[in-house]
Curated annotation (Swiss-Prot):
EC assignment: 7.1.1.-
Residues annotated as transmembrane: 6-26, 64-84, 89-109
Origin organism lineage: Bacteria, Bacillati, Cyanobacteriota, Cyanophyceae, Synechococcales
This protein's name: NAD(P)H-quinone oxidoreductase subunit 3
Pfam families hit by this protein: Oxidored_q4 (PF00507)
GO molecular function: NADH dehydrogenase (ubiquinone) activity; quinone binding
Length: 120
């Protein structure tokens, strides 16, 4: 098929993987009803009649807590494989993990010092 014959199946997989979502979106666009008024513009609240407007302002502090959570959630994702392979990796990997944790603790201390974790 092309210059690397061992990768024909992989190229076919990539083409199919790209074509399936595009085909699904095009099919949806062609077959979906075209109504743009009425209940489609209302906010969905678990089958109940909507109360109030859909646009409300959230306190920015929610976003700060979410960012801190995401940072430490990603830390957990990176440290779990390291912990599983701890015996095989040796001292250098342990030092690298300590540096990684130290950098994140500095970020936490900075956020704490700036008052990002205060709710007053």
């Amino acid at each position: 098929m092309f210059a690397l014959p061992g990768y024909d199946a992989f190229l076919g997989f990539l083409l199919i993987a790209a074509a399936v979502p595009v085909l699904a979106l095009v099919t949806n666009k062609l077959l979906a009803p075209k109504s743009r008024a009425g209940e489609r513009q209302l906010t969905y609240e678990s089958g109940m009649e909507p109360i109030g407007g859909a646009w409300i302002q959230f306190n920015i502090r929610y976003y700060m807590f979410a960012l801190v959570f995401v940072i430490f959630d990603v830390e957990t994702v990176f440290l779990y494989p390291w912990a599983v392979a701890f015996n095989r990796l040796g001292l250098l990997a342990f030092i690298e993990a300590l540096i990684f944790i130290a950098i994140l603790l500095v970020a936490l201390a900075y956020a704490w010092r700036k008052g990002a974790l205060e709710w007053s």
